[in-house]
């Protein structure tokens, strides 16, 4: 039997259908993919696209708009692009690339887009921030006057780093650049400084080893690791440094101190060169694009020490009376010690000083292989702790005199007493600057070692026994002068009482002969 509907039921059904119809119009700017090659997509028909805007592609894939041309847009795909085809629809999103930020990222390993890759589950933060941001202006900055202790005697005494400084670590491959940066991160344990380690274009096995070392030394808890491995696209390697910087800025903006390591910017420049050439931008010196200086300057200028007013304004009055800082340690790899190449000279001119590591010193067993002659810190001197500043003046002079005399002494058969003493002192200072990896040194221990060599207490100690003597001296002071060591570590001060205790303690230890 056929079902009959009343006219009233029919009108009710029609009304219900009409109510369910969505009338809200969504304005979408769409275009068509005309070519896909090497991670670059060209899109025809997109209008009103922003520089750096996210473009939505099929299968939840996104691309970053970099080339805005008259009739097309050149964009670099973030992630896998093998499923993309000519004729696919591309849509604008109206937003620029953002990454997750917050303390929840500490202890985690994420990729360049802030997605966790360590198998520890979701990040648990809803906060995001744009990867590109204008650096704080001059008005909002404060002078660098607080130290960042790296735990290296040679760096903290001769090339001190301050909070908010940019200090370049430069040298050939296999000279200990990453080791120095990782030790600096490990040494921030207990200081309140949060760390971000950005690995650009490194092997996944190398990054896994670094994460393991950080965990073993109790440093992963205060560190975010951003990994863009060698197997990832050039786009991910290019963007990773900016993503890491955004994560570090979160702490700076809220009146905290952060340290970021870019390892290394040479590989980022190569990735950017690859993207630029694929986008058919005109090449310049060494085939780099014309804006490769801006690539690094806009990144490194974001490292700063910001004023109390900046923090108060940013947090809308929630945090008052606190300055924030982001200290940057960019790493550059040179080829055969050539610091006059394009990218090294660029980064040297942007940063506030450089630590130059030499292959010859490294191979001679002087590690860290710091060349004190051409390494410099332009602003860190005012940030040095009082005790190290007071004691370290003689170190640089001793090394400079030693280098000058050592070259001269090769040709001279008989040396006068004063010259011989200077050479011997220089030998001992050079030996004393050696340090093992993953063994950062406290302020008190550094001060003890420097004081002992400056005051001539090590002149009668054989050079091959120096490091054993130093180790024994530190242990002796830890056992007999624990309070003094804690006081020096806490305050970094220097007075007659501390000097008297140092003199007495070193003399006592020398009489024991237990090294």
UniProtKB/Swiss-Prot annotation:
Molecular functions (GO terms): ADP binding; ATP binding; proton-transporting ATP synthase activity, rotational mechanism
TM region(s), chain numbering: none
Required for activity (site feature) positions: 375
Family annotation (InterPro entries): ATP_synth_asu-like_sf, ATP_synth_asu_C, ATP_synth_asu_C_sf, ATP_synth_F1_a_nt-bd_dom, ATP_synth_F1_asu, ATPase_a/bsu_AS, ATPase_F1/V1/A1_a/bsu_N, ATPase_F1/V1/A1_a/bsu_N_sf
Keywords tagged on the record: ATP synthesis, ATP-binding, Cell membrane, CF(1), Hydrogen ion transport, Ion transport, Membrane, Nucleotide-binding, Translocase, Transport
Localization: Cell membrane
GO cellular component terms, semicolon-separated: plasma membrane; proton-transporting ATP synthase complex
Enzyme class: translocase
Name of a matching Pfam family: ATP-synt_ab
Disulfide cross-links: none
Gene3D superfamilies on file: 2.40.30.20, ATP synthase alpha/beta chain, C-terminal domain, P-loop containing nucleotide triphosphate hydrolases
Entry annotated with the keyword Ion transport: yes
Database matches in CDD domains: ATP-synt_F1_alpha_C (cd18113), ATP-synt_F1_alpha_N (cd18116), F1-ATPase_alpha_CD (cd01132)
Catalytic activity, EC: 7.1.2.2
Catalysis performed (reactions): ATP + H2O + 4 H(+)(in) = ADP + phosphate + 5 H(+)(out)
Annotated ATP binding sites: 171-178
UniProt membrane topology term: Peripheral membrane protein
Function according to Swiss-Prot or TrEMBL: Produces ATP from ADP in the presence of a proton gradient across the membrane. The alpha chain is a regulatory subunit.
NCBIfam families assigned: atpA, PRK13343.1
Family: Belongs to the ATPase alpha/beta chains family.
Subunit field text: F-type ATPases have 2 components, CF(1) - the catalytic core - and CF(0) - the membrane proton channel. CF(1) has five subunits: alpha(3), beta(3), gamma(1), delta(1), epsilon(1). CF(0) has three main subunits: a(1), b(2) and c(9-12). The alpha and beta chains form an alternating ring which encloses part of the gamma chain. CF(1) is attached to CF(0) by a central stalk formed by the gamma and epsilon chains, while a peripheral stalk is formed by the delta and b chains.
Protein name, as recorded: ATP synthase subunit alpha
Lineage, broadest ranks: Bacteria, Pseudomonadati, Pseudomonadota, Gammaproteobacteria, Lysobacterales
Recorded name of the encoding gene: atpA
